[in-house]
């Protein structure tokens, strides 16, 4: 599974069905071994190193590491994939630069390891058209008859005109004035924060983004659900964090233009529970939007733009949620960029992973595969962010205890690290640099843990701020 929010939701459902925790192993970054028993800790490590439990719930990160990472703990898990059934949920979220590597992995498993692969998605990517396509046959498990499809239609996607931020806010206010609850999903945190701050006629409004720690987001989602259940006319302005794994339903949705897969995922939060005959999701192209640092979103947005132009003269693609439109979108997405972009380019080596792992055809009698170099340079998620403990709710107490643990009590530190898991925000280098310059972050010499000690950089509405709120205080 790609997202921790999806894992949390699905893991709970699986446990309820299986009703035997001994059969299930969760292996992802949010799972912490709560026991101080050394034997239990060793058993946990053994399980995660070898994936010996009958049911493994893990992330795409761990799965791809099993194939391509140089770490022995990752390689050891590979044998567990043989003769297994592997379900990839939300497969459309596989990063664009890893499509070829993903195809190699599942093709090998299906062809040589007697492994059954199930790819789940509302917007199934056409992996047969990737630079290095699937080498195994892929069949649809579920095909809806034409006469049945209409019965499942809960939402209509409407392409609106291009607007600036003020136009989006005015459009949103018009919807609010019609007494609908509303979800607005943006491509960046700054866009979401600006729109949130400018909406002023909502009965209740909320903001969601990765600028908030996990526990903060969970608390906001709980408030949103409660308000929706009580017929409060809610407005939520969010980034992509709400697109999957969040079970909420709004009467109207605005999605700033992005990839069609993201648009359809967002539309899944519209009339989700069938509260009305039909819900409406509006696509708005934001004028002057800068997505240079978010190439996957930018590429998807460009492919969607091209498809939307085509809908004007080709009725075949009028319904953006149809299989024909989804296939057309992916065809444009894959062909709009160089095929090698899907092969995991490593800039410091001037080569991609496919080149490193391919045998040199010029040396017929020499196996010339750079497996170690490839593994050392393989990272599913770009590891240029820093995890910072933030002072949200109990996070403030945890930071205080970290600071008072001056003599480095190991057991206390381990306990604090476990408790801090839900109070962490990922910061990019430029954010950390600013916080360090303002002396708002403390780095613990004993552990290297970053603590946000200036309360003015974190608030209950927006999470981690770009600029300090001077009404708050320092630790």
Question: PLM features: residue spans?
Answer:
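Conserved helicase motor
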Residues: 25-40, 187-190, 205-221, 237-243
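SF2 helicase catalytic motif II
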Residues: 61-63, 72-109
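Inter-Walker segment of RecA-like/P-loop motor cores
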Residues: 20-68
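Conserved two-lobed SF2 helicase motor
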Residues: 50-70, 228-243, 255
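Conserved Walker A/P-loop ATP-binding site and its immediately adjacent core
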Residues: 1-18, 29-31, 126
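Interdomain hinge/linker at the junction between the two RecA-like core domains of SF2 helicases
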Residues: 116, 122-176
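Conserved helicase ATPase motor motifs in RecA-like P-loop NTPase domains
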Residues: 2, 90-130
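C-terminal helicase lobe and adjacent C-terminal extensions/tails of nucleic-acid helicase motors
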Residues: 110, 170-179, 185, 190-200, ...
């Amino acid at each position: 599974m790609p997202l921790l929010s999806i894992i949390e939701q699905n893991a709970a459902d699986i446990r309820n069905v299986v009703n035997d925790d001994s059969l299930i192993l969760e292996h992802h970054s949010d799972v912490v071994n709560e026991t101080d028993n050394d034997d239990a800790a060793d058993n946990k490590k053994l399980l995660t190193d070898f994936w010996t439990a009958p049911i493994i719930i893990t992330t795409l990160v761990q799965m791809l590491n099993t194939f391509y990472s140089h770490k022995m703990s990752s390689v050891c898990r590979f044998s567990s994939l043989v003769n297994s059934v592997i379900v990839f949920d939300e497969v459309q979220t596989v990063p664009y630069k890893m499509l070829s590597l993903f195809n190699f992995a599942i093709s090998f498993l299906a062809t040589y390891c007697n492994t059954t692969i199930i790819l789940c998605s509302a917007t199934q990517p056409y992996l047969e058209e990737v630079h290095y396509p699937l080498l195994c046959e892929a069949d649809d498990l579920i095909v809806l008859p034409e006469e049945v499809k209409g019965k499942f239609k809960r939402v209509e996607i409407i392409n609106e005109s291009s607007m600036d931020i003020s136009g989006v806010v005015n459009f949103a206010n018009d919807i609010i004035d019609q007494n609908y609850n509303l979800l607005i999903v943006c491509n960046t945190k700054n866009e979401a924060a600006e729109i949130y701050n400018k909406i002023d006629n909502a009965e209740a409004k909320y903001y969601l983004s990765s600028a908030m720690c996990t526990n903060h987001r969970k608390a906001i989602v709980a408030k949103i659900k409660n308000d929706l259940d009580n017929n409060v006319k809610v407005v939520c302005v969010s980034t992509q964090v709400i697109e999957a794994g969040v079970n909420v339903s709004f009467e109207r949705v605005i999605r700033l233009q992005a990839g069609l897969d993201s648009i359809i995922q967002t539309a899944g939060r519209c009339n989700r529970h069938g509260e009305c005959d039909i819900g409406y999701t509006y696509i708005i192209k934001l004028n002057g939007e800068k997505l240079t640092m978010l190439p996957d979103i930018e590429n998807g947005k460009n492919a969607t733009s091209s498809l939307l132009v085509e809908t004007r003269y080709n009725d075949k693609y009028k319904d953006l949620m149809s299989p024909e439109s989804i296939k057309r979108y992916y065809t444009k997405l894959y062909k709009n960029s160089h095929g090698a972009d899907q092969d995991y380019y490593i800039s410091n080596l001037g080569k991609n992973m496919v080149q490193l792992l391919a045998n040199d055809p010029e040396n017929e009698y020499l196996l010339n595969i750079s497996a170690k170099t490839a593994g050392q340079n393989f990272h599913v998620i770009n590891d240029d962010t820093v995890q910072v403990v933030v002072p949200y709710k109990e996070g403030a107490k945890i930071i205080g205890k970290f600071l008072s643990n001056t003599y480095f009590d190991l057991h206390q530190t381990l306990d604090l690290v476990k408790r801090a898991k839900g109070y962490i925000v990922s910061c990019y280098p430029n954010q950390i640099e600013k916080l360090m310059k303002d002396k708002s972050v403390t780095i613990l010499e004993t552990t290297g843990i970053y603590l946000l000690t200036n309360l003015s950089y974190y608030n209950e509405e927006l999470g981690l701020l770009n600029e300090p709120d001077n009404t708050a205080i320092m630790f």
